[in-house]
């Protein structure tokens, strides 16, 4: 088994890290810069910064916040929310991000994936996908439908087919978030995660539902996902990144260690 990554997600609203359940009832938790620095020091493999109100407010991602976080973290750092065009991608990368995540924009304008991959390299382009189980039908053969605008708008697009098309267009990675399990802390949505991970060649990040290290172990034992994205379980102090990685190692799942050899 290849080394598996643990990624912490910082959903940011009004310059505060926030978290809700199934995209609703968000509460503010803390300062993104300080939290990002702490997770970086703790040995998390990557950070994801989502400016969750930027698209709805029709403004670019908070570039100044990206610059501040980039100065404090020494790990790969992806940003999303308010990425509206190639110029926004370029500015985010110049601000210190290694990757940019496109979600609603990519669904509405798929050509942005190919354009971004050509301009910056596919390793810089992450497809963020919000999916929800709606039942198997002729239109949605996998049973999982793509939603945009923070999970508010159903698109009538099958999640598995969209993942395969996005790979063809040039994404370097797919972050699959399950709306059904987001913030619930009862475990990841394994079915669609494994479907997509086995159907594409690019890395797949599972998002939505992690509540205990056992859920992460379960993810890697039962699917071909490359990384686990966590938020609530570390933001609220239930678990730490070193603790999560320690339990993964104990379960026989290889993890990346810090330069001093600690997990």
PLM region spans:
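Charged helix-capping and loop-helix junction motifs
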Residues: 60-67, 110, 156-160, 186-195
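C-terminal helical cap(s) of enzyme catalytic domains, especially alpha/beta-barrels
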Residues: 113-119, 217-259
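Structural preference for beta-strand elements that scaffold enzyme active sites
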Residues: 5-9, 46, 74-78, 99-101, ...
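Glycine/small-residue-rich loop that forms an oxyanion/phosphate-binding "nest" at active or ligand-binding sites
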Residues: 53, 61-124
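Catalytic cores of alpha/beta
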Residues: 73, 77-99, 191-228
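Conserved, mostly hydrophobic/aromatic
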Residues: 11, 39, 47, 79, ...
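Conserved anion-binding
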Residues: 12-14, 18-19, 97-176, 180-181
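Glycine-rich, proline-tolerant flexible connector loops at the mouths of alpha/beta enzymes
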Residues: 46-65, 104, 175-186
């Amino acid at each position: 088994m290849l080394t598996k990554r643990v990624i912490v997600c910082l959903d940011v609203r009004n310059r505060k890290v926030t978290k809700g359940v199934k995209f609703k009832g968000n509460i503010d938790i803390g300062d993104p810069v300080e939290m990002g620095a702490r997770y970086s020091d703790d040995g998390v493999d990557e950070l994801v910064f989502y400016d969750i109100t930027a698209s709805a407010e029709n403004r670019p991602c908070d570039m100044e916040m990206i610059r501040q976080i980039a100065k404090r973290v020494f790990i790969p750092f992806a940003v999303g929310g308010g990425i509206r065009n190639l110029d926004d991608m370029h500015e985010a990368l110049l601000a210190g991000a290694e990757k940019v995540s496109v979600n609603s924009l990519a669904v509405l304008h798929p050509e942005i994936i190919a354009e971004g991959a050509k301009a910056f390299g596919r390793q810089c382009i992450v497809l963020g996908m919000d999916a929800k189980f709606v039942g198997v039908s002729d239109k949605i053969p996998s049973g999982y439908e793509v939603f945009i605008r923070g999970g508010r708008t159903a698109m009538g697009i099958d999640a598995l087919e969209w993942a395969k098309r996005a790979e063809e267009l040039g994404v370097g990675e797919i972050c699959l978030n399950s709306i059904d399990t987001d913030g619930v802390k009862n475990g990841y949505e394994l079915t669609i995660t494994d479907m997509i991970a086995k159907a594409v060649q690019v890395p797949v990040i599972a998002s939505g539902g992690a509540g205990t290290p056992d859920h992460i172990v379960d993810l890697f034992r039962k699917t071909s996902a490359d990384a686990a994205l966590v938020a609530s379980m570390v933001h609220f102090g239930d678990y730490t990144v070193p603790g999560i990685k320690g339990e993964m190692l104990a379960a026989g799942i290889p993890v990346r260690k810090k330069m001093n050899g600690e997990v």
